[in-house]
């Protein structure tokens, strides 16, 4: 029972719409009506500016990061294969990612999973996050597309999990990669059409 409560709480925390709340509280803007219409960090930068964008990014990362430690904080007794699986920090963090992407508060239409996924990886393996961040910013420096950089970093995580034989990480990163590609489908189309806006700060 406690495992179910933990997973639901992780989802609900992940579903907290940081960008929407910051936009409405401090800018009187619903960021869903501007830019890409997304509630995540990238659109927050675009619509609300850098300071607010950094705050939203921090909050979205923190959502994923904190949930990784739920199995340590909750009195969870894992006495079998299934219970052990669902008390793994990566799996608990995955529920936060799902909450961020499909928030119950916003009719299941949320962000694109990038920052919250980074928070989960930070909590589980900071060195891996550093490697993925280097890949992300390297691709961003070359191509100037946040969407492309995010997808390549996610796929790199899948490849890395195969190399280190971490199959739970493989499962989670595989799911996240699929979600990222689906959520960035319109961005991918615009990239091929040459219509995707490029960042200007790098």
Swiss-Prot record:
It is an enzyme of class 2 (transferase). Pfam families: G3P_acyltransf (PF02660). The chain crosses the membrane at residues 2-22, 54-74, 81-101, 120-140, 162-182. It catalyses: an acyl phosphate + sn-glycerol 3-phosphate = a 1-acyl-sn-glycero-3-phosphate + phosphate. Pathway: Lipid metabolism; phospholipid metabolism. Its EC number is 2.3.1.275. One of its GO terms (cellular component) is plasma membrane. It is a multi-pass membrane protein. One of its GO terms (molecular function) is acyl-phosphate glycerol-3-phosphate acyltransferase activity. Keywords: Cell membrane, Lipid biosynthesis, Lipid metabolism, Membrane, Phospholipid biosynthesis, Phospholipid metabolism, Transferase, Transmembrane, Transmembrane helix. It is found in: Cell membrane. One of its GO terms (biological process) is phospholipid biosynthetic process. Catalyzes the transfer of an acyl group from acyl-phosphate (acyl-PO(4)) to glycerol-3-phosphate (G3P) to form lysophosphatidic acid (LPA). This enzyme utilizes acyl-phosphate as fatty acyl donor, but not acyl-CoA or acyl-ACP. Belongs to the PlsY family. Probably interacts with PlsX. This is Glycerol-3-phosphate acyltransferase. The gene is plsY.
């Amino acid at each position: 029972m406690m495992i179910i409560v933990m997973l639901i709480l992780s989802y609900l925390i992940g579903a907290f719409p940081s960008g929407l709340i910051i936009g409405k509280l401090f800018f009187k803007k619903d960021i869903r009506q501007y830019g890409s219409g997304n509630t995540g960090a990238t659109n927050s930068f675009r619509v609300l500016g850098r300071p607010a964008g950094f705050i939203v990014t921090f909050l979205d990362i923190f959502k994923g990061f904190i949930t990784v430690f739920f199995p340590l904080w909750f009195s969870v007794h894992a006495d079998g294969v299934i219970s052990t699986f669902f008390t793994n920090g990566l799996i608990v963090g995955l529920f936060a990612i799902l909450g961020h992407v499909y928030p119950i508060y916003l009719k299941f239409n949320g962000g694109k999973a990038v920052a919250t996924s980074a928070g989960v990886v930070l909590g589980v393996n900071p060195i891996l996050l550093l490697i993925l961040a280097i890949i992300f910013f390297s691709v961003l420096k070359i191509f100037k597309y946040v969407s492309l950089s995010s997808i390549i970093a996610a796929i790199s995580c899948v490849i890395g999990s195969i190399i280190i034989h971490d199959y739970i990480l493989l499962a989670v990163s595989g799911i996240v990669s699929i979600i990222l590609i689906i959520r960035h489908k319109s961005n991918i189309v615009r990239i091929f059409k040459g219509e995707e806006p490029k960042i200007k700060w790098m």
